């Protein structure tokens, strides 16, 4: 968000970073949003100019005040996500890869029921992340499981719940 999420007027900001999967070198970035986009793209540009990596993004310091930024800036968060991918703490797939998944893949939408009712990806069942632990015994551990949410945080949390409960795929 352009400022702390609890602060009035907070609006979403989406950051896409491109990085070398071998060493994490930051190669490019795009940001979509409103307030503060210029500040964030300049932060990313400075890291790219000096040949920095996604690990540098996690360490960036910035001025913090709730009306203008969150304690962990969106640029820091992009670095954390990339670091999790590089270190194998999370696995991701792209939307275009969904059609290539085995037919018996378990597809779970971990958004709330109200969000799911507004629209969902065909073939995804709705198990809200807050209820996932209650349904673990219903999920086969020998099948590939793909989770989806609106932004990424709940998908990551669902992934971690599954991994911590012995799901390998």
Show the residue positions of the predicted features.
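Catalytic cysteine-centered active loop of the rhodanese-like fold, especially the PTP/DSP P-loop
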Residues: 133-169
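Short loop/helix-cap segments at secondary-structure boundaries that form the rim of catalytic
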Residues: 101, 116-123, 137-139, 164
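A short, well-structured juxtamembrane/interface segment
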Residues: 90-101
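Short hydrophobic beta-strand that contains or immediately precedes a catalytic carboxylate
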Residues: 106-111
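Generic hydrophobic alpha-helical segments
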Residues: 44-45, 98, 145
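Short acidic-hydrophobic, aromatic-tinged amphipathic segments that line or gate anion-handling sites
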Residues: 127-128
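Flexible, glycine-rich terminal cap/loop adjacent to redox cofactors
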Residues: 1-88
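Short, glycine/acidic-enriched loop or turn micro-motifs at the edges of active sites
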Residues: 23, 112, 131
